[in-house]
Amino acid sequence: MKSNRTFLHTPVSLGYESLGDASIPGTRIYVTPEGKHYPSITTVLGSIIKEGIEQWKAAVGEQEASRVLHHAGTRGTALHLIAEKYLNNEADIFSPNTMPHVKALWCSIKPVIDANVGKVVLQEAPLYSDIFGVAGRVDCIAEYEGTLSVIDFKTSRQRKTKDYISNYFMQAAFYAAAFYERTNIPVTQSVIIMAVDDDPNPIVFKENTYKWLKDLKQVIKTYNGNFSYK
């Protein structure tokens, strides 16, 4: 499938190419160029929903829970890769193994991307913050409706409201803060583009990144009080 848009890329140097990783069971740890060990933002935010996930597993059964989680992880990874290739102006964005339901999810969000995404600054880039003591990999930082934004592509089995995705907004706020720390370039907007199973109409959430920093700080503080990873 050939891209019908050409996206302009204006890369920004972070001062490093990649981050290292340390092996700690159950926790993703990044190692910064200075040798500091930071937990991933997904690990930190995952700690606040862990209890709810365990309750859900108990309710639906381990086998069904494993099936649903595997399906969600597979389709999410596949959609991210397609979006990354598309924004990189690659002609072939589907692999021979791309499933029909993933193509359907992509077709639902493609018009949103075409109509609103402008210059691309970063894609699938590692970021870390010495202020927060956390690291992670951002999906995309690009202009959205003319405003530099952290853009994340999500999938869901059903339509959601923003009350159910506060962790997404905190994640985006972290990426914005870490990017500013590394580049001194502010990113004030987060955009969550959510593709929904069997629904041609995606959901787009937009938030001010600064709005979620207070909640993010509290979650990190709680996580650091409960876990030791250094």
Walk through the language-model features, giving the residues of each.
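Metal-dependent nuclease catalytic cores that hydrolyze phosphodiester bonds in DNA/RNA
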Residues: 1-135
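Mg2+/Mn2+-dependent nuclease catalytic core
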Residues: 124-229
